Regions:
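A solvent-exposed interaction/effector surface
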Residues: 1-145
Length: 145
């Protein structure tokens, strides 16, 4: 667990309001929309990202890109949150249980160490590899100060 200063890295995303019940079955479809666009765009692409603006949740699903771009339908230019953030890494193939455990660990660490969270959080997924045990997913929670 650590505190880092993050920068507003550009992303290509689909923004959506959903429910926590629907989310596990929907994120793949939204990510597919983004990658369908990225395959035809002249953009450098990076890792997959998911940003949760609040507990509704209002989400942004997409990927890092090298620069801002003109929006295309539901795929819009955005940025990862910038500022001080508490972070940890979930290791191994991503699973709902593993990602949830990483979020809980950040929350508990922040509460134990007096760091107030804004509610904005995000995940950055490592590039896929043949050996899933080497996969890492970074989990961030933006702090109030």
């Amino acid at each position: 667990m650590s505190i880092v200063t993050t920068s507003a890295a550009p992303t290509a995303v689909v923004k959506q309001t959903t429910t926590w019940e629907r989310w596990p079955t929907w994120w793949g479809e939204l990510l597919g929309e983004v990658w369908a666009f990225l395959r035809t765009a002249d953009l450098q692409t990076g890792r997959n990202v998911m940003v949760y603006a609040d507990d509704v949740p209002n989400v942004e699903v997409g990927a890092e890109v090298g620069e801002a771009f003109a929006s295309d339908g539901r795929v819009v230019a955005s940025v990862l949150p910038a500022g001080r953030a508490a972070t940890t890494v979930a290791r191994g193939a991503p699973s709902p249980e593993g990602i949830d455990a990483a979020h809980r660990a950040v929350i508990e660490w922040c509460e134990a160490n007096g760091h107030e969270r804004t509610g904005v959080r995000w995940e950055v997924y490592d590039h896929w590899r043949d050996d899933p045990s080497t996969f890492e997913t970074a989990v961030y929670w933006l702090l109030t100060r």
